[in-house]
Amino acid sequence: MNFVFISPHFPYTYWQFCNHLKQNGVQVLGIADAPYDSLPNELRESLTEYYRVESLKNYDEVYRGVAYFAFRYGRIDWIESNNEYWLEQDARLRTDFNVSTGIRSDRIRSIKEKSEMKKYYAQGGIPTARQIRAAEGQEAVRQFALQVGYPIIAKPDVGVGASGTYKIEDDRGLQRFYDEVGDYKNYVAEEFITGEICSYDAIIDANGNALFESMTVWPPSIMDIVNLRLDLSYYVDREIPESLRELGRRTVKAFGIWNRFVHLEFFRLDSDREGLGRKGDFVALEVNMRPAGGYTPDMINYAHSIDVYKIWADMVAFGESQTQLGVQLYCAFASRRDIYQYLHSHEEVLARYGDRMVMCERMPELFSAAMGQQMYTVRLQTMEEVNDFVSFVHDKKL
């Protein structure tokens, strides 16, 4: 089997996908724009061959890389990056090289555009926030806001995270949005929903069935964390509620997902919401056809005593995985920003949680706006311990 892995060096931990593919007898063929000597040793040892391009954004260059691999090794069976940024290019490459193991260009809108996602949620009978395209005009959006109530959220139709997101509180704020955002036609506006963000993180086989499922609980507003420079914490739950499991599986079926690691986001309502559900119910937010960001796959491993990199590679190579869950724990992440003075020193955090700490490091600059500069990740038995850990890391000096 020939597997072309696009950008296998980023995020850093993706070498583990490549390593398990190699262990499963797959030829892993890497394409990226980083010098070969800069690749981690673990990645270099996992690749059959590496093709460097000047820029991964140059489709012609990447195309030539895949063509070279096809000439040298024969038919390409898989093309994948597991990276949001390259999903559209991955689909185009699959289309051009007739690779049928993943999404092609004719399906890409359904997983990239928030406005398109709504159609599939509706087909699956999955509750989701009401939405309108900003391109319909200011008055149409104002009428929408009167219907669902201010505030509303405006965000790019294509995009992830908090980048380019606006919380609009009233008609004056709506006017400012249209005055100041030059590309407003590429935005959607949604009703503002309050509650925890919970993700259904799963590995889906060729038949659309889940080989592995987990839940991660995120802060309610990454936008506020970035804009207000707040501290970040989140955790992987030791269990997944049956209601989220059922909604996650329905979403997979509605979108026709197969052969993928998915990160499907839902709100868990913190109050009754007419037309959507009661407090504690899950409401769909958006789909992401790749693993959760940062070190979340590793946190999932620590929470469930498992290896999702291996499960995914088993899915690719064999269509199944025999990996069994181990001890179930919470895995919690909390980070700090260098601009703040904290009540407990770095050394005190290590002294208190060192025996349960699984990761402790400085965050890459690319992630620091959302995730801070110093992170701590621990395995814990109870939700009370999770809350105590977050408080201990985040409490500040007066």
Show where each model-derived region lies.
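ATP-binding N-terminal substructure of ATP-dependent carboxylate-amine bond-forming enzymes
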Residues: 1-106, 383-397
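Short amphipathic alpha-helical segments and helix-helix/interface helices
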Residues: 15-22, 118, 142, 178
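Short acidic-hydrophobic, aromatic-tinged amphipathic segments that line or gate anion-handling sites
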Residues: 50-57, 132-136, 166-169
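Glycine-rich phosphate-binding loop signature in dinucleotide/nucleotide-binding domains
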Residues: 69-76, 146-148, 182-184
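A conserved helix-loop-beta module that forms one wall/lid of the active-site cleft
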Residues: 94-164
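Conserved ATP-binding module of the ATP-grasp superfamily
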Residues: 127-131, 151-154, 163-199, 221-232, ...
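ATP-dependent carboxylate/phosphate-activation module, predominantly the ATP-grasp catalytic core
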Residues: 172, 191-257, 261, 268, ...
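Peripheral (often C-terminal) accessory segments that flank ATP-dependent C-N-forming ligase machineries
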Residues: 311-398
